[in-house]
Amino acid sequence: MRRTTIFLLLLFFFSMAATGATKSLFEKGVDAYRQGNVDEALRVWQSVYERGYESGALCYNLGNAHFRIEHTAQAILFYERAKNLLPRDKDVTANLGLARLSIVDRVEAPVRLIIWNWVDVVRDFFSLRELRLLFIGFGVLSCACIIAAILLSGRVSRTLPTVVLVLWIVFGVVFVWRSILDSQPYAIITVDKVDVKSAPDETAKDVFALHEGLKIRIKSGLAGWLNIELADGRRGWIPAAQAEQI
């Protein structure tokens, strides 16, 4: 028991030290960026990201640095990652929109009923992490309210337990829906141009071409190839090395 406690304490202190070092590196990148040394800031922030540290602020700053040196695809990639973590941040949304102006391809999604646009807004208002926490939180709160209603039968209103239970179900449905959607992730085209094939083979017919910075959905993968789908429903295959997952 004592050895386990010592191990956990050491793990905690090493974790705290690593967090402090990461924060110090991040601030070093901020200082370099403010001084106009974008390449140094990018190098430092990239090293932090490659250590496995991911936050909305880090991804946003990486997007800004790539945008400054005209790395369109990487800028969009990191802005998209930042948006997944900070879905309501206006600066992230604005800069992502600005970066998208450089995209050559214009893919129009089919017209849908306006109610589905509202559903998308509600779904994307929270990050997946936030939805998970809300689902768990309302689940625990629902159990507590139901137990309290049973133990204090006749002395408390059943309105609160009912409302909490409904919210738990709603967030549960949205969380599961979002998880299913995220199981087929999006990616960004990272090369100047890629010819989309009709099959996962270099000799297959070219069906259309895509350019740097376009967002695509990954439907499946096969031996170094990605089966992709565009917002307008077109599908095809591209080499996996020519896109990077968000």
Give residue ranges: language-model regions.
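Membrane-embedded alpha-helical segments of integral membrane proteins
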Residues: 110-151
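Boundary regions of SH3-family modules and the immediately adjacent low-complexity/disordered segments
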Residues: 72, 148-149, 158-191, 198-201, ...
